[in-house]
Amino acid sequence: ATFMIQNVLPAVLTANIQGMSIEDMKAGLETFIPSATQTPGRLNLFKFKNFTVLLDYAHNPAGMRALKKFTDSMEATVKVGIIAGIGDRRVEDNNELGSIAAEMFDEIIIRQDKRLRGKTEQELIKMLDDGIKMHDPTKKTTIIPSEKEAITFAVKNAIEGSLIILCSDVIPEALDLVQKFKEMESKGELIFED
């Protein structure tokens, strides 16, 4: 993705300024494989048997637009977004985040339990919901304040071929939960009992 190239260019420039050889920079770039281990929260893709989860730290309009550009080419029967607002940003920024989400996703789950940054959970949820409704007043939207419960709900209700795009600002917890579900599936365990 273009924005990944934009992210690596400053690292290459810094390495060059610090006197690193071109061969060492080349070796570093060739052995760098984006993954949940090396880049937690940056386009971490988890392919389950019947659906896919993409975990990313997109948390502002620019990040969300870059994520949209990346996911627009991904095939899915339905795209479900799990989003949260940002308390130290303007109302307009949170509205825009909601509006971009309404463009990106067939269904949206708003969660808002951590890192409120000066606003209340209800204020942030309303800002996102207002932004969603500005773009599409009929967009299917579910409010589940707990990130853990929102992820669990999305995975439990995933239909075949769906893509769940999880925009998280608490990467370790979200990553642990998704990896736990993936591990359960790979062991043949039911993720959820009916």
Where are the model-predicted features located?
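ATP-dependent carboxylate-amine ligase
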Residues: A1, P10-D194
